[in-house]
């Protein structure tokens, strides 16, 4: 993805532009290069500096909904998703107090339609190191 470096010291959401490429060879060849937009969300922060064409949990040109992730509970929010990830990491042996922040890199919906083949969660410890 082409954008600025992800800086964990900032507790703001970020929008990224990039390209997804695919190339299949063999009997049936296929390839594509598609432009994409992704967003990095700090699940513990309510602060945002996103443009007015982006909304959380409601329709807009670009939007994101917590209910599309985690337990997929209607009317859930970032905090619910944060708790879901804390629960998953505790099953892996991490203690809640070891995790300082959780960020989600995902694809937003465009005019209410979404295609999200991949969501990545970044968990940072109390020393601000990715774990």
Task: State where each predicted segment sits.
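Mature, function-bearing regions of proteins
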Residues: 1-131
């Amino acid at each position: 993805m082409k954008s600025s470096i992800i800086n964990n010291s900032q507790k703001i959401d970020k929008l990224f532009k990039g390209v997804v490429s695919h190339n299949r060879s063999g009997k049936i060849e296929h390839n594509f290069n598609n432009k994409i937009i992704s967003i990095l969300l700090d699940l513990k922060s309510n602060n945002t500096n996103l443009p007015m064409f982006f909304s959380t949990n409601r329709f807009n040109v670009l939007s994101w909904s917590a209910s599309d992730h985690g337990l997929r509970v209607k009317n859930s929010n970032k905090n619910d998703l944060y708790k879901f990830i804390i629960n998953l990491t505790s099953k892996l042996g991490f203690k809640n107090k070891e995790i300082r922040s959780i960020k989600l890199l995902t694809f937003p919906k465009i005019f209410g339609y979404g295609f999200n083949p991949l969501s990545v969660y970044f968990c940072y410890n109390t020393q601000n190191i990715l774990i």
